[in-house]
Amino acid sequence: MAEENNEKKKPSSPRKRTPKKNMSLLPDEGQMIQYSLFDTKQKINESTSTLMDLRVSPFMPVDKISHNSALAREFVANKNILKRETAFGTVEIRNRLLTQYHKMILDCIMVHNVRSVVYKGTIAIYFSIYEIAQQLGLEWNGKTQKNIQEAIEYIKDVVIVRTDADNPSITSSYNIIQEMKYSSKEQAYVIVLSSQYAEYFNKTISINYNKRFDELIAIRGKGSAFIRSIIEFFITHDASADNIQRMKLMQLLETINYPCETPRQITSAKQYLKEYENELAKFSIKYYSGSQLFEYSGTTDIRFIPPLDGFID
């Protein structure tokens, strides 16, 4: 596997290709792999995210975390572990804290990748950092490239431990990314998903919101990470005009791990809800300030992908 530290200053966009024998940067793909991995690859190709990565998200509802914030201090005091318990399940984030910035980058890789291949018991995904910068509306320069690379390395460092609310005895532990490298041959970066994450993807519900993704990441400005987190949470629910999902403000803030220890933080949350009312409405989310109640009546172009049968050995 060829390695380089950087892409060219402004690399050309890699073209999507039809996989051919022995063409891959990653050799011997599929030759000694169980067939279930090809099903998993197809499932990942058809998904934007796992449902639980949105509903009980390891990504904090902010774009940046200050080192002296209460959340960061709690994380360090607890030996770099953050545990979140919700009505939908429990998640532990270990080693590093992740934000909506990291989530957008990961989603860009999932949605706008060049291609994916089966590789050594897991899945590898080719992508362009330049394309990610374009999708996020960032000016392309060395600093932007470095920041995105570092963000992906952050994701690689994190260990996620999940417990299902319905089955507390079932626990999943995984890194999302096993490694990241650059191929001069392909003119693209490649991330290799950990085999544990591929297994988790295989056995859990995933969600496809690709058709709404560009609209979601176009929500920008102060408070936008908070609003995106709300949208990501609600779209995991199978709602409709005849099956409206409702939730009180404080329950939602606790579920998405929004800091609400002080009256000022709650006031800020309410102000963001007012400022981004139209963006929420595009995803059929309505907030009633008087009763402090959310209503969600379902979003078009959202698709749920069921778990595959069996597990990856």
Give the residues covered by each predicted segment.
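Charged, alpha-helix-forming regions
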Residues: 2-313
